[in-house]
Amino acid sequence: MKRFFAFDADATEFSWTNAYTCARAAQLAYAKKAAIGRHIEQEWGEQEQIQHHDWRFIENETTDTQAFVMTTDAMILVSFRGSAAPTDFMTDAAMNLIPGPFSGDVHEGFSNALASVWDSLTAAIADFRGDKHKSLWFTGHSLGAGLATIAVARLLDMGHAVDGLYTFGQPRTGDVRFARDFNRVFKSTTFRFVNNNDVVTRIPPRVLGYRHTGTLRYFDEDGDFHAEIGYWRRLFDRIYGRLADLFHWGTDGIKDHGMEHYMSLVRAHYLLDMKRLHAAEEAKRMQIQKELSQMPGV
């Protein structure tokens, strides 16, 4: 199956189509600049329904922060690159809380990294938006998910419109007040994917005051999807995942964090969703044909 970017720019609820494209963009953010451009051209440029697509690479070499912004006539998608090593942001200094958007505090390392590309990022968004109403979306994996969350919060706090956020393997980003204020205005359009034992989703620890934001979307040890799952069920599933991984190389918590695993899981459920939609449309078509055939004179 050839991969293409597809997106519902007007979605107001969870969408597997948008989740798939955001996962693809979060994965692509790890590539080199030239490779990103090549894939966008191949995966967007070959589609007749995608008009006037463009993109821009954002980078600060000093802070090693990267993102890219891509656009069509209808939407803009910002994807932040994650960290090559999940432990890069686990030092005590990096986990300090500092004043952030809204009334709460956020992760100092994430905030400083975002600040280093903020002017370039907002300039790209403004240029691509122009005088058109384009929906604005954010995504990222790992560190990139934290950057995307704070970026969304900053824009919302400044009164700008943002339409959705899909994150994968996201660490906790801010404190209780930040999470409360963020969720008050954006929880219903923020979808935070967690894969079973992904260790990064449990740091920085709650004991340091950190809390999660958004609406949980959970994949269990068997790859099954849960839109809602309680604490105890998640705990037992994590234990099951650990036990199942005992005699395999590597650590379950690190392996579950890999963006390639998120991509595989999201793609599988996206394809299932497409099959369900196709089956529903076919059933509707058959019903219409049946009703027409029973009408007098038809």
What are these regions (language model features)?
Residues M1-T139, L143-V298:
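Non-catalytic, mobile gating and regulatory segments of ester bond hydrolases
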